[in-house]
Amino acid sequence: MVVAALCLMGSAAQAQQNLSWGQGPQVASPDVHADNSVTFNLIAPEAQKVQITGDFLPTQKIKVEGYGKVEAPGVVDLVKNDKGVWSFTSEPLKPELYTYNMMVDGVKIIDPLNVYNIRDINNLFSVLLIGGDARTDLYKVNKVAHGTVSKVWYESPTAGLTRRLTVYTPAGYEKSKKKYPVFYLLHGIGGDENAWSELGRAAQILDNLIAQGKAEPMILVMTNGNISQEACPGETSEGFKVPTMMLPKTMEGSFETAFPDVVKFIEKTYRVKKDKAHRAIAGLSMGGFHSLFISINNPDMFGYVGLFSAAVDQQQKGGAEGHPEVYADRDQKIDCLFSKNPKLFWIGIGKTDFLFKNNNDLRSYLDSKNHKYTYLETDGGHIWRNWRIYLTEFTPLLFK
């Protein structure tokens, strides 16, 4: 009895330690007000300077080697009160999923009062969702039938690795006998098989679009485009390796060459329709680059192709160790793809995206050949806000 009581007391003390009951000022962060302005708070009485940076702030231009000047989130100062609480209140924010960080005396941190955070490559961000419009409601978990998200390992003989996918199956898949179309969705440089399901809210978007009757029930396959990796950082045989953006064999042809291994695995493992009319591929940035070259090197594989802020250019990135043949004769391969009459070739790009000119150059070539495509131009740059929009616009067009 005494031992049990001591154990319970110890557990309670630990719980109180974790919850910090009654310790210091009691404030919330972020605190969303009725007009959608947001107050961000940080308890740091000893700090000399506290700032916040996030995609809810006006952008700033920064110079990035190899890319010139690109857009980056703005930065503002927080103000300290007499209790040691630093605060900043934003303007009323439009409905959107926002990410942000705080900086304490120059050290970037997540908001310690916000339990919701997310990893993007090697950075952690705090997350804030402002609802209130039809599009942002697609990013929420609503009271609709839900699909299943699974982490699935497959053998890639071409890569010589066992690798991992994230696979979404729609509500009712487990109890159904029907066959489904498949949408292959690819991430950008430094991302992995978790990027679209976490940062992109892909499962929530598909759940809601399908429930609203705006999208066909489909299987969504989210790959890891870093062919040298088994899976996302921390979940491979390499252990807790530090994530990095620049990985080997990302844009030199190896991933594109090995992609048929993914299709073969999915069509062997899941109840799917195994023809071009029921396969789609799309990706953001590097994933758009991959989607373009996978589709034009396999012109009978995909009836639907989507390029989201795609890293398209004429440069052949394969070298002696890669597969330069993947990138050879790009324009002739594009012509071949269009001669096969794809049901949809879709391009989306932000007006201030550093890849805007590259995408315009691709469009100019398509126009010169009278190749039909769908184009969406949005505000903003190379950001997840745009890529979620593109997913919500592209998906309802599939498999009609």
Give the role of each language-model region:
Residues 18-20, 32-400:
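Non-catalytic cap/lid and distal C-terminal segments of serine-dependent acyl enzymes
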Residues 1-11:
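Bacterial N-terminal signal peptides
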Residues 27-31:
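Short beta-strand segments of immunoglobulin-like
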